[in-house]
């Protein structure tokens, strides 16, 4: 099964290492780990390569989080992919820091990036990889997700990226449930 991995985040160096940008940073980690580079097209960056006899396309939307869905008509047309190939990597404030959750389908909850994608696709039937960024009652949700990780938090998230970089490229229909068990039982 070919895989279209879309990491959500906000473009610009001021968002680097923020909780909302874990999707971007996982894509960056995959690019570096596999000796790739990102190419820019209109409103997204991508890398297209083969891994274990399947096509992998990595995407970083450059539309800002709340408009992430805007890229999908051109992405699906350019790469000849379908919703069945899609895995969206996104932050989740309902999961503890470092906890991950892989799902085949799901809702949008309070996540505007997922809401934008679901509206654009007309469906919520696409894969999601949630990365727990913790929660905080001291600030608003917006302030919290746009805040940078601190010291030991950043080290934990980097460990998550290393682990996920080993796990997600191998996802396919035959091992999806095994990958769910492996990823969902991990914690950093």
From Swiss-Prot:
Main subcellular localisation: cytoplasm
GO molecular function: peptidyl-tRNA hydrolase activity; tRNA binding
Site feature: Discriminates between blocked and unblocked aminoacyl-tRNA: 10
Residues given in the record as tRNA binding sites: 15, 64, 66, 112
EC class of the enzyme, as a word: hydrolase
GO cellular component: cytoplasm
Biological function: Hydrolyzes ribosome-free peptidyl-tRNAs (with 1 or more amino acids incorporated), which drop off the ribosome during protein synthesis, or as a result of ribosome stalling. Catalyzes the release of premature peptidyl moieties from peptidyl-tRNA molecules trapped in stalled 50S ribosomal subunits, and thus maintains levels of free tRNAs and 50S ribosomes.
Family assignment from sequence similarity: Belongs to the PTH family.
Protein name: Peptidyl-tRNA hydrolase
Gene (UniProt): pth
